[in-house]
């Protein structure tokens, strides 16, 4: 058997369940802060929308940080591994096309966690989108453009600023 990364070894024997909620996280290669460039972060966010439009997942909350992303999804079709492979591949192509990069964008593998139905999704969505605040990137969440949530985050001091944010934020969904 070939050597597998720790995250891939953890998935041996596990399966992806349709309509189950998962928190997916992955890091950039060597934790480079590629998405400090907001435009490049938007290219990743657009792949979340593509996955949703193609019926692979419903995005419940996500944030693109300078060197990683967190994505809370309801899996609709395929497996988590297929979804992440597709998202990472397409976002790599988009970023490389935009920047002329030739190197890997992402670390291999990803972290995933299946949520229990009784877990508080609103609390988790708030935790995810508050990452930029905890990291000290902004003072108000509304000042950070690379996040979205359809669950209970409308009161995190963002609405006056939201109309000026990038197309990554759809306040009608909050």
What is the predicted role of each segment?
Residues 1-174:
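Short catalytic/metal-binding and nucleic-acid-binding patches
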């Amino acid at each position: 058997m070939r050597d597998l990364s720790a995250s891939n070894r953890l998935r041996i024997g596990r399966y992806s369940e349709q309509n189950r909620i998962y928190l997916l996280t992955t890091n950039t290669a060597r934790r480079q802060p590629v998405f400090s460039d907001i435009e490049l972060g938007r290219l990743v966010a657009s792949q979340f929308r593509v996955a949703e439009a193609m019926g692979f997942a419903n995005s419940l909350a996500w944030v693109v940080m300078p060197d990683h992303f967190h994505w809370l999804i309801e899996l609709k079709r395929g497996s988590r591994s297929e979804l992440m492979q597709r998202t990472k591949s397409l976002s790599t192509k988009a970023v490389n096309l935009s920047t002329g990069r030739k190197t890997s964008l992402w670390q291999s593998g990803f972290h995933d966690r299946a949520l229990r139905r009784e877990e508080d999704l609103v609390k988790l969505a708030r935790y995810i989108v508050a990452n930029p605040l905890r990291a000290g990137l902004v003072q108000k969440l509304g000042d950070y453009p690379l996040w979205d949530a359809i669950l209970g985050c409308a009161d995190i001091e963002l609405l006056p600023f939201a109309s000026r944010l990038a197309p990554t934020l759809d306040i009608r969904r909050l």
